[in-house]
């Protein structure tokens, strides 16, 4: 979601984002993304690789959401393999991030209605591009990293899916 992109931009300003194609259909978003130097994923990763490598050499990090879209039900979707392909092709490490709560406070069904709640990001250990413990191919790495993120997401769920989280507190009060 665009809330994820905004939060990541606050963490590290030298970031280039590969976004889903649908975001570019909204004129305001498209203008902002183009101005920021972001890329739509429909350009194809082979076409983007030289531009991305140039930006990485200038100190930028590449941000890709491998699910490609948000989930309707908070379950982590299958990962597309483009991020892992780029990691292998451009020799870039992967920094997996588990995000909990963004889909609750800004659900896919109510795209522009921000609800109160807690959003947390957990950065997992960096994976070197040549680390084969997650798989020999980028396809295998995609599946292994997805499992790693699901495990972390589940632990974040255990920690934050309580009445102390404003999102759940509001739901609890609303239901009684």
What are these regions (language model features)?
Residues 10, 46-176:
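Non-catalytic C-terminal accessory region of glycerolipid acyltransferases
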Residues 1-44:
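Catalytic core of membrane glycerolipid acyltransferases/transacylases, capturing the structured
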């Amino acid at each position: 979601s665009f809330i994820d992109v905004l939060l990541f931009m606050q963490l590290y300003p030298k970031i280039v984002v590969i976004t889903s194609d649908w975001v570019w259909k909204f004129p305001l978003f498209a203008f902002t993304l183009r101005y920021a130097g972001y890329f739509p994923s429909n350009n194809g990763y082979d076409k983007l690789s030289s531009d991305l490598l140039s930006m990485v050499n200038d100190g930028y990090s590449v941000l890709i959401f491998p699910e490609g879209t948000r989930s309707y039900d908070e379950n982590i979707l299958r990962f597309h393999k483009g991020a892992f392909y780029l990691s292998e092709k451009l020799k870039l490490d992967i920094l997996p991030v588990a995000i909990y709560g963004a889909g609750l406070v800004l659900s896919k069904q109510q795209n522009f209605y921000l609800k109160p709640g807690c959003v947390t990001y957990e950065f997992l250990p960096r994976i070197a591009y040549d680390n084969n413990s997650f798989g020999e191919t980028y396809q295998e790495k995609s599946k292994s990293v997805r499992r790693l993120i699901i495990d972390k997401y589940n632990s974040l769920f255990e920690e934050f899916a309580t009445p102390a989280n404003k999102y759940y507190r509001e739901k609890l009060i609303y239901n009684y």
